[in-house]
Amino acid sequence: MQEKRPTLDGLEQILELIASDPRIQPNFSGWIRASLRSGGGKIRVLRYISDHARSDGAPPQILDVGAQFASLAVYAVKLGYHAAAVDYGPAAKTFQKVASDHGVDYKECDVGAEALPFPDNQFDFVTYTDVMEHHAFSPKRVLREIQRVLVPGGRVIVVTPNHASIYNRLKLLFGGSVNDDFDYFFDVCADERIYDGHHREYTRAELRAALGRTQFQVLECRVFEQDLIPLLHYLRRHRTRGEIFPESRDLFLCALGEIWALLHLPLDRWIWAVGEKTGDGKT
């Protein structure tokens, strides 16, 4: 039976379904389950798609770029959507097999060097969330490809860290760094050919410009904070299992986010943007 509305409980079921697959390595299983902490982002995206789906009732066609273990796409299929996904890396083949078994058209694609493996004008929505900051190259090529595969009037949903957040400003003010942890970058990743952390983060003005320069009409571009509820939901589950969770910092920052929102201050850690393809989308 198909769900009508994305929920946190529904996402948790999807994460457990993927994490418990015997093809998933044990070290990935814990990471997949722990992603529930920030699961509000995926719920936010899926609810946006649900609220802006086609008026004729046809199931929306969605593509998730940088899908990782494809929990968003698998949940989308459960909701009755047609979902595709792309990613690239050592674990992509395993994730592809698992996601394909749940109805997702998952393809390996290096978006920095290859065209998206789909025809023009196919998708109603493309999700491009928590991906841009990991690129060691300009996102221009990727956004142009997203333009190509969207139908006219289709939308891209972008979520990325806010480089101008109050937290980054305070770190710099007190002599800290806004980059990824130095010890992890310098020592743990010393033998890696490609660094998988954040290469470049963006401000709201930069993200708006990136969408505009690739011929998207910017419908939304605002900052937000991760919701408290998914994090509390995750902590409650882990508390019942007797596990220890060092999550007090995230709880504090999420609570502060509620205050910034009430005061209408653009200080939060994340940017949400929606761009619409107009006309033929040629750039």
Region annotations inferred by a language model:
Residues 1-2:
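Basic/polar N-terminal segments that are highly enriched at the extreme N-terminus
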Residues 283:
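Short polybasic linear motifs
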Residues 5-40, 98, 108, 114, ...:
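S-adenosyl-L-methionine-dependent methyltransferase catalytic module, highlighting the catalytic core
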Residues 46-53, 57-170, 272-277:
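Conserved SAM-binding loop
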